[in-house]
Amino acid sequence: MTTPISPSGTIPDGSEPDRTDSTDSASESSNHRPRGRRHPSGRTAFKAASISCAILAAGAAGVGTRGAANGAWNAGEGAPYELWRQWSAGTSGLRNLVAAATLAANPHNIQPWFFDVNGDSGSAEDSTGSIDLRADPDRVTPLCDPDGRERAAGFGCALYAIEVAARAQGKRAEIEPWPDGASERSDHIARIRVVNDAPPTSREQELATAIPRRHTYRGPFTASAPEQAVLDSLTKAAPDGAQLVWVTEASAVARVGDLYVEATQAIADDTRMSADSFAWFRNDRSQIDAHRDGLTLDCQGLSSTMLVAAKILPAQSREASDDFWVKSTREVHTATARTYGIIRVDDVDNPRNRLDGGRLLQHVHLAATAVGLGLHHMNQVTERIARDAAQDRPDRLSQRWAAITGIPAPQSLLAFRVGHPERAARPSPRRYLDDVVRDAGQ
C-alpha cells in the first residue's frame, strides 16, 4: 500500500476526473472498460495555473527555501540513493549480495531486516560463506499489515535478490529457512550458504543487471497493454512455491479496479490504519537523509514539473494526502491499468508460502524491469481484508475479489499492476549498508 502525498489538493497529475460514481454497484461497474489515455483539458490547465499562482504568492525567497529543503532540484540524488548507483552485478563478495537484498522490494520501504555476514575466511568481503537474514522487530506496520504477510513476503524478495546476485558471481545461494530448529515465527528468517557454482546463464545475468534499475512505478501507463507473450516471459525460470495469475480481460480489469478504489477509500476512512501508513512518509529531504527509508514524493509517479511544485508547496496533512491517494487510485492507477498480476499461494497464513510468494514477486519485478515494463505493487484489497479480520469486522471484499479473479482471498498473497510506463520510475531511499550488515561475532 502506498499513500501519495498531495502536491496541491487537486486531481492527480496526468489524469482527469472520473465521471463514474464510486458508489456504483459491482454489476454496473463490471461494464466499464479501462479508460484510454487522456489529453490535457481546461481543468488540467487550471490546475497548473493554480499551482503557479500559489508558488508566486509564496514569494521567491520562501519558494527557494522550501524547494531546497525538500530536494526539489535533486530528486533521487545524494547519499540515500547511492546504493542504487553503486551496486553492480560484477562486484564480488558477500556484502554485495546483502546490498542486492537491501535493494529488494519491501512493504512501505520499511526495510525490515538486518544481516549477519560470516565469510569463509572470517571477513564480510569474502565471496563465499554464510549470510543470516534476521527481522528487525521495530520495523513493522501493524495496522496496514496486521498478520505480517507483506513483511514476510518482503523477506522472500530479499532472499531472491541474494539468489540472483549470487548467480551473477558464479555462486549459488543455498537457503535454509528458520535454521537451527527455529520456529517459523522466529525473527531468524533464514541462513544462506553461498558456495561456488557454474557461470551464470544469460537469463541470470539479465535478472541481476535489473537489480539496480528495479523501482516501483506509480505513474500512468500508456493505453497499450503488454502482450501475452511478454507476460508469459516474466515467469521464465521463476522460483517454485507460488503461482502468478494474470487478470487481462477488460471487464475483469475494470471490476478489480473498482475494488481497489473501494478498498483505498476504506483505508483512508480508517484513521488509525491511515496513520500507520503515513508514519512512514518522509515529507522533506531532511527526513529522507535522516531515515533513508519510507515513502517519498519522488516515488509517486508525478511528472518532473508536478514533482517540483509538490516539493515547493507546503506539506499536506494526512487527510489531504489520503484524498489525493484515493484520487490517484481512481484516476491514474486503475484508470490506466490494463493488466493485474496476483501472487497465489496455498495459504497466505503459511510462513513458507509467504517467503515463496515474495521470491516470485521479486523475480517478476526484475523480469519486468529487464523488458522495460513498469510495475506497481497494489495490496489495498488484501490489506483491507486482513484489517477487517483482525478487528472481527464484516468482510466486504473477499467474495467479490474471488468472483472476479478466481482466487480465494486466503490464497491471494500479493498483487500488482504492470504496463508500459509513461515516465521513468525514480529510486526510493535505502539505508547505509553498514547499518544493516553485521560481521559475525558482533
Where are these regions (language model features)?
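Acidic, surface-exposed loops and disordered segments
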Residues: 2-442
